Each structure stands twice: as C-alpha cells, then as structure tokens.
Design a protein with these regions (language model features):
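Deubiquitinase catalytic domains
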Residues: 1-184
Length: 184
C-alpha cells in the first residue's frame, strides 16, 4: 500500500451538528484507516447491496472523499441525516435522533452497516497439508471462518474482525493440546 498519497492530506475537521461529536470522532477514526480507504477507493469493482446499508456506505464514501480532497472543515449534515434514516429503518432508535451517544456503539453500528452493504456469498477453499499442531489449529480456524462467512463474506471482516483462539494444554506435557477452539 502506497501511504505517500495520504501525506499532508485528510487534515479535515468535522463541524459538530447538534450532539454529533460521537459521530465525528468515529468518522475521523474511520477516515484515517488506510486499509478501509483502499477498499473504498476500489468500490467501483465491488457490488454494493442496494439497501439501507448500501445507502450509508455510499454516503460515507462521498463524505470520505470530501474529507481527503482538501484540508478544511466539513459539516457532515447529509451523512447524519442518512444515519438517522437508516437507524429508524433498522428499528435502532439509538442513532435516529440528536441525542448524545457512545462512540463505540456507533462504531459497531457503522461497521455492521458497511459489512452488510458488501456481504455476498463466496466459495472459500482451504488447501495445504497439516504438518504440525500449529497447522492443525490454523486449519480449524479457517474452517470456522468458512462455515460462518461463506454466505455473507465482505472485506470488512478482513479489516475489523479477528479470531480468538483458546488452547487447553496438558498439565503434564506442555506440547500436548487437550482442546482448542476458534471463535470470531
């Protein structure tokens, strides 16, 4: 990834429109995730679902482009109205008005919208030979991912989601794995 295109750009402030400071904080964070910017820059090659999630992703992409076009102050009024509309449509009253809210809750909401806008069915194949216990663990993690996300995969999973691995080892033999589990 060529980070030079970001040098001295994206130094844009967001004007507070009511109690939107939690939204503005989240937008600044998302705007400076270069992996997300790369994905958004290549959206023309992706099919965006034509629903409320697609609306919010499209509106975010427009605002993001404006934020990176020149260093200035932007009032994200249209984006906030789209968030309120989508929030009401999803029966999520939390972001449907002008009440103060928690930035982390909004971040989960917006990431979920992005994922649902891009999700699609994919064919996930796992190849290779298991040579050691680490390979075996990796295979079980990939198998879990294949089962969970083959019908609704998006690149958002690659950027924002991880895998939690729990390993229980033998007390007598540290090399003996009694159990392991992989969870998203």
């Amino acid at each position: 990834m060529d980070l030079s295109k970001y040098k001295n750009k994206g130094l844009t402030g967001l004007q507070n429109t009511g109690n939107s400071c939690y939204i503005n904080s989240c937008l600044q964070l998302l705007s400076n995730l270069y992996e997300l910017n790369e994905l958004m820059d290549n959206l023309e090659n992706k099919n965006v679902n034509n629903n409320e999630n697609g609306i919010i992703l499209s509106e975010w992409n427009s605002l993001r482009k404006m934020m990176w076009k020149e260093n200035c102050i932007v009032a994200p009024l249209r984006f906030c109205k789209v968030v309120q509309f989508v929030s009401k449509k999803k029966n999520n009253e939390l972001f449907s008005g002008f009440d103060q809210n928690d930035m982390s809750e909004f971040l989960f909401f917006i990431i979920d919208c992005f994922h649902n806008a891009l999700k699609r069915e994919v064919n996930m194949n796992i190849t290779g030979k298991v040579k050691n216990s680490l390979d075996k663990l990796a295979m079980s993690c990939y198998e879990m991912m294949r089962k969970m996300y083959k019908k609704e995969y998006s690149e958002i999973l690659d950027i924002f989601y991880g895998i939690s691995v729990t390993i229980i080892k033998s007390k007598e033999n540290d090399n003996e794995i009694l159990s392991n589990s992989c969870e998203p």
